[in-house]
């Protein structure tokens, strides 16, 4: 049933389904700039083409100053008018006619391949090679095997598509390019709309040329060159007809934000210069593409299915197999590699709707799911274009802070208006959620810890954190009695305190823990970066004093972390949202992370997990599993991960946002969205199950789930650029750990539960078996330290 060579191949035996939303089940690939979504039909094949920079609709505006209304937020809180308090700024912005709209990714076009079929096809399959990104569709018609292969070249920035057969019956089909299908134009509210885009297609020599005019007046389109080996090719005004060819190669390039007359000629010339054949182009591309995939390895020894459809059936009927979880890790990396260019959209480069639901990236949590696994996966540099965009919008973020809250520093909205940093919506969930900047700061600081890129910190990173720190310095006020900070109003997404009217739905409260942990992270990072940059002593001291004023996190009467340091608002532990778990919820350990606090986090998250069935969406479960993995509770994380995969995986392994099948685990969503962030987030979960770090502190798993009997995690990158390889065998109770640092350093190592002994350490006195720790473990520059750790056997067979 299982072939080791197929480990990096996802094979399906059915084409995309889903009726008029078939694109949601397509097989996808791309190069970060262009992407294709292959529906996989034998007779009428549709391949949807997307470009990273093609958007439509959306508008910004001039953000008015409504900071004079902030005082009304506190007044309404004091009078228990919570809903009124939450909507103060929203109403003020609406009154001044600030009505921004987020834009939508716009599909460039569809490739249409119509093939005569003489009988019901047999031996059908479609597959993705995760190492190369190549998508294949294979079938037999009257005994003759037909093969179609496509990838998006990183070498030539070209879509490369080949059709061939290996029998007496040759390749025959019609090919054209069309405007993306408009029959399913619906919003999330099931409202129909007219697309009203002017598009045209024509043939020109060996080319099919498709062009369209966007709503901003710019042109977009696609130029495809058709190359036949044998057979007869004829053309009409808008399509090519190929009969009895040995093989056909189609090369295509797209353009956006251009003028079509000039761009079409340029692309025709570029396509004519590409050197064939297909295999040569694929080899050149794979050398570049595989670097995204092979930089880290997760190997989980298990029985496996070559057929993903069977693996999914088994998953739905029972539990996810270990091999499926391993493939989900690879698939997440594939989606990242195919989508990551200067930015990533929630729909990747695979969108098939004109107004795709939730297709605008959210800077809060979603962005971190898309990128944060890359820090440990040797892909840290991929986040730099994202940081550049945030830095370019710094002036807008300052306007946001001043005009909304009357504060210094910056405010980053979770949703941004097109081509700027202003809020993209005025709903309270965007306007009141002012902790987004701390999430970006966590990414910046994590990038620094894993790359030691001090030049970036000097030029951009420190200023960004400093501006965020200034916001919290202004926003938080010192209690004269306790000498610690208070916060008169805040927003804890997306939870309503448990002690209010059951019919009320709001997230505003005072002394929200998410405010304090966010400010604490920023102040702490500023202190550390101040030392690294040799900042003035008074400046470092200022941030340290602010850090010292952050109040301790409180625990409720049941022993779980409170969401509010308040006697007015009570924590709702029946909610699946965990904003007070920052930064663990995005896979990052703060510098002051302690095992006792991590135990509190694990217990709190697991309690919420047990009490929230029926309320989950896939994002909740992804964040819970990430949090548990980051604090070392790999067993708990694995349980949540299995629930996520079992209940939200669709037929092409994309995780749906909601429970559209109504199985009872999640909140029912009839119009669930296609988003790749949860798939990529799985990579973060699985990596963090094995090992985590916080500066010079390295933490191994407390215990691994019994299902992961044997395996390895190779070439993971920790803080201080330390590389780590792990091999584990639960039955034997053995963990082999290799650490390699680029410079002389010492680290502290937290050991697994049930620790017995360790080999490979020169000084046994640094081992504290009782507290499961090793202190002052020396690493010599560019030399591998090999350790063999023995722990209690956690499985019996």
Regions found by a protein language model. Give the residues of each.
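Asparagine-centered strand-capping/turn motif at beta-strand->loop junctions
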Residues: 165, 739-743
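Alpha-helical scaffolds flanking conserved acidic
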Residues: 322-326, 458-463, 619-623
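Aromatic-residue-lined binding/catalytic grooves and analogous aromatic/hydrophobic interfacial grooves
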Residues: 1-425, 446, 532, 539-575, ...
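C-terminal capping/lid segments that line or modulate ligand- or cofactor-binding pockets
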Residues: 26-49, 53-54, 105, 359-382, ...
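The feature captures the catalytic groove of carbohydrate-active enzymes
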Residues: 253, 258-263, 347-360, 408-459, ...
């Amino acid at each position: 049933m299982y072939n080791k060579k197929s480990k990096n191949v996802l094979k399906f035996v059915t084409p995309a389904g889903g009726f008029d939303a078939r694109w949601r089940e397509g097989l996808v690939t791309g190069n970060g700039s262009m992407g294709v979504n292959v529906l996989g039909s034998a007779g009428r094949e549709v391949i949807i083409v997307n470009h990273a920079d093609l958007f439509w609709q959306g508008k910004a505006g001039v953000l008015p100053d409504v900071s004079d209304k902030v005082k009304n937020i506190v007044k309404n809180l004091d009078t228990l008018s919570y809903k009124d308090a939450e909507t103060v700024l929203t109403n003020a912005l609406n009154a001044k006619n600030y009505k921004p709209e987020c834009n939508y990714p716009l599909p460039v076009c569809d490739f249409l391949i119509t093939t005569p079929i003489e009988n019901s096809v047999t031996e059908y399959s479609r597959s993705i090679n995760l190492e190369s990104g190549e998508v294949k569709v294979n079938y037999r018609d009257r005994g003759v095997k037909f093969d179609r292969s496509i990838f998006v070249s990183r070498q030539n920035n070209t879509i490369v598509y080949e059709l061939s057969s290996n029998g007496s019956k040759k390749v025959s089909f019609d090919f054209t390019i069309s405007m993306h299908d408009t029959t399913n134009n619906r919003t999330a509210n099931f409202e129909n709309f007219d697309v009203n885009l002017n598009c045209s297609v024509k043939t020109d020599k060996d080319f099919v040329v498709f062009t369209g005019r966007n709503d901003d007046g710019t042109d977009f389109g696609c130029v495809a060159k058709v190359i036949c080996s044998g057979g007869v090719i004829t053309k009409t005004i808008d399509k090519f007809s190929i009969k009895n060819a040995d093989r056909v190669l189609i090369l295509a390039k797209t353009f956006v934000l251009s003028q079509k007359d000039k761009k079409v000629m340029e692309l025709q010339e570029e396509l004519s210069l590409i050197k064939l054949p297909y295999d040569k182009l694929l080899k050149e591309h794979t050398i570049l593409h595989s670097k995204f995939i092979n930089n880290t390895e997760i190997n989980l020894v298990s029985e496996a299915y070559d057929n993903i459809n069977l693996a999914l059936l088994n998953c739905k009927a029972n539990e996810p197999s270990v091999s499926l979880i391993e493939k989900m890790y690879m698939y997440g990396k594939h989606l990242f590699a195919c989508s990551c260019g200067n930015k990533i959209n929630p729909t990747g480069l695979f969108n098939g709707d004109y107004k795709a639901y939730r297709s605008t990236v959210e800077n809060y949590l979603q962005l971190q799911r898309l990128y944060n696994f890359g820090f440990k996966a040797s892909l840290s540099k991929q986040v730099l274009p994202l940081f550049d965009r945030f830095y370019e919008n710094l002036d807008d973020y300052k306007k946001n802070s001043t005009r909304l809250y009357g504060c210094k520093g910056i405010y980053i909205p979770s949703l941004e208006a097109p081509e700027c940093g202003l809020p993209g919506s005025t709903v309270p969930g965007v306007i009141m959620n002012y902790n987004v900047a701390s999430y970006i700061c966590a990414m910046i600081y994590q990038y620094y810890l894993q790359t030691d890129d001090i030049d970036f910190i000097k030029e951009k990173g420190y200023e960004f954190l400093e501006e965020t720190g200034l916001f919290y310095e202004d926003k938080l006020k010192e209690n004269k009695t306790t000498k610690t900070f208070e916060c008169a109003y805040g927003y804890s997404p997306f939870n309503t305190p448990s002690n209010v009217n059951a019919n009320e739905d709001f997230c505003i409260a005072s002394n929200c823990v998410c405010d304090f942990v966010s400010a604490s992270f920023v102040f702490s990072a500023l202190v550390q970066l101040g030392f690294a940059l040799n900042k003035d002593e008074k400046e470092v001291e200022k941030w340290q004093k602010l850090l010292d004023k952050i109040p301790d996190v409180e625990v409720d009467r049941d022993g779980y972390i409170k969401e509010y340091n308040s006697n007015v608002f009570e924590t709702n532990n029946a909610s699946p949202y965990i904003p007070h778990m920052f930064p663990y919820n995005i896979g990052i350990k703060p510098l002051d992370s302690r095992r006792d606090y991590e135990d509190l986090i694990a217990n709190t998250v697991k309690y919420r997990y047990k009490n929230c069935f029926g309320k989950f969406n896939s994002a909740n479960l992804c964040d819970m599993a990430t949090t548990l993995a980051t604090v070392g509770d790999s067993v708990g994380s694995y349980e949540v991960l299995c629930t996520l995969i079992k209940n939200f995986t669709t037929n092409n392994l994309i995780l749906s946002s909601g429970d559209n099948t109504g199985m009872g685990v999640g909140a029912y969503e009839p119009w669930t969205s296609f988003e790749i962030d949860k798939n990529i987030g799985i990579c973060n979960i699985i990596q963090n199950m094995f090992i985590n770090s916080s500066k010079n502190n390295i933490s191994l798993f407390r215990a691994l789930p019994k299902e992961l009997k044997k395996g390895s995690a190779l070439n993971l990158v920790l803080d201080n650029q330390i590389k780590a390889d792990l091999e584990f065998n639960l039955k034997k109770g053995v963990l082999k750990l290799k650490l390699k640092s680029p410079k002389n350093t010492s680290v502290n190592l937290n050991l697994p539960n049930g620790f017995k002994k360790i080999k490979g350490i020169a000084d046994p006195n640094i081992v504290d078996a009782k507290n499961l720790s090793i202190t002052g473990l020396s690493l010599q520059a560019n030399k591998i330290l090999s350790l063999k750790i023995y722990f209690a056997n956690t499985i019996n067979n």
